[in-house]
Amino acid sequence: MKEGWHKASIMSSAHKGGAPVDFADGTSESGDIQVLGKQLWRILPYIKPYWKRFALGITSNMGARICDLLPFVAMGLLTDAVLSGEIGQLKEFAFYGLLILGSFTGLAIFQGISNYSWETLAQYLQHDIRMAAFESLIKMEIRYFEDRQTGDIMSVISADVNQLENFLSDASTSMIRIVITFSTAFAILVWMSWKLALILFVPIIFIMPLIYFFSTRVQKKYRESRQSFGDINAVLSNNISGMGVVQAYNAETYEATRVGKESSSYKDHAIGATVQRTKFLPGIYVIAGIAFGLLATAGGYLMLEGPSQGGITPGQFVTFLLMSTRMSMPLFILGMLVNQIQKSEASARRVFAMIDLEPSIIDREGAESLEEPANAITFDDVHFAYPNGNKVLNGVSFELNRNQSIGIVGPTGAGKSTIVKLLLRYYETDGGAISMNGSDINELTLGSIRDQIGYVSQDVYLFHGTIRENIAYADQNAGDAAIVEAAKLAGADEFIQEAPNGYDTIVGDRGVKLSGGQRQRISLARAILRRPPLLILDEATSAVDTRTEEIIQRNLNQFKDGRMTVAVAHRLSTIRDADQILVLVEGVVVENGAHDELIAQDGVYADLWAVQTGELDKTTGEATRHDG
């Protein structure tokens, strides 16, 4: 991994000790307006790996600015030479002409090198910053993503990072150009007349307070604007992903209104920033005009006095006027530049807030890797409640060993899928313990735990790409034979072979081109390909027909040899052959045993079985079976 991507290398010590920050608005808990560019300064450590390119950009920019100002000096010298009668022949004029031509040639060369250096540097930096943000994001626990809108997260990694790229390739080079131009021109003017040079401090005295005044007002507007942009992305993401539902319910007008509301909010915040900017720019023009007028007036007076009285020559006056026009341009640019800096500061605040994220579920100090394949799972009096306070598990206990399978059933909300999430350490228990091979999973590394598991979620997710790529996601090095074998075990090979391009058929975003049952079977094939010691099936075949499910179950019975299997199901036929079946009601294991044992107990499980097999009317509770 590249050095620039390491979070540790870019977290400022000041931030580490500060208040918590969320990229959603990028503000500290106090809500104070930060100093201009405070977040943008955090880009500097990312430049370190590319310091040679950075140095080349600086030096070439300096060369370009010197070449840009040199013709003004030449014109002043030429003016004095002509007025004093020192030159009068064409070849002497040609010298100054060639000097000016050489200056413009040098300007073209140096400026080209500078542009290339800065724009390529911007690309390297935006890549490293984007990767740092993403690498920080993917370490966050599942709860983090459940609490946030996908569109807003995406806007940080895409739009906000792109805004920083624009800053790096445009605004930052403009700032450097302003500094170099102003300092070089100032040095030349001091050399000619320190009295006139002092006049240059007049605009600086007034511009700096104006910049601070503007930044404190516009920064909040741009921060709100970036958040509104994230909200637009979130609504659009929901609409596009759920377009089938939108159209099925004739909700196009309703959704257009929702998008319009968020877009209008973004528009209002952007206009608010524009209003502040339009108040700021005229002040810059006025100050620059005053400075130019003072230079012209004072310069004319000193020229009339002449060098003998401490004044300047006509040529020096010409140079002063030309220089002052060149120096006034940076002041005009500065007005627009401060606006761009504020936009970039708002984006940087969101990007670095994401980079600063710290997951709550991590490898504990001294955590050990699970070296041997998992062969025993134990839940010992496990309690768990979600952050909203909803208590889901109340003292759940069970054991699962190699070559065994366990089925988990119960009404919706009983805590079945929560057991799966705890096994994957998406969450941590509030009480009790979960162990794997006799070790508390909290004392094992996350990676070694998840390496043991092949997981099929009830919310099947397929990536945009081919069927082959989606199955091979579990093992990037798997060959075609292994992929096909996994698909056969999952009952997917038959429909894949009938697809237009077989295993190279594109499934679409989230597998939208496939049926629910087809998506489930590809997800199951993905888990099988991993050949995990622990197979977790969370409603893995709920969308397939009964015949296909029977085929899959037969195949899985062979695959389960030497493994542990946890199956969550509403369809009891799925887990009928499990060695152990847990019946959960309101987070409590009310029944535990094999299928025949639970039927004999004539309890909750027996009632569920009777309803599903048609032996009990689920609406009246009356028996429907008939003797004889």
Question: What is the role of each PLM region?
Answer:
Residues R53-G63, T173-E224, L295-I312, M329:
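Transmembrane helices of ABC transporter permease
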Residues F54-F110, S117, V190-K195, T297, ...:
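Transmembrane helix-loop-helix hairpins at lipid-water interfaces of multipass membrane proteins
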Residues E86-F95, I188-V202, G272-R349, M354-I355:
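Helix-loop-helix
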Residues D356, D363-R364, L370-G628:
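ABC-type nucleotide-binding domain
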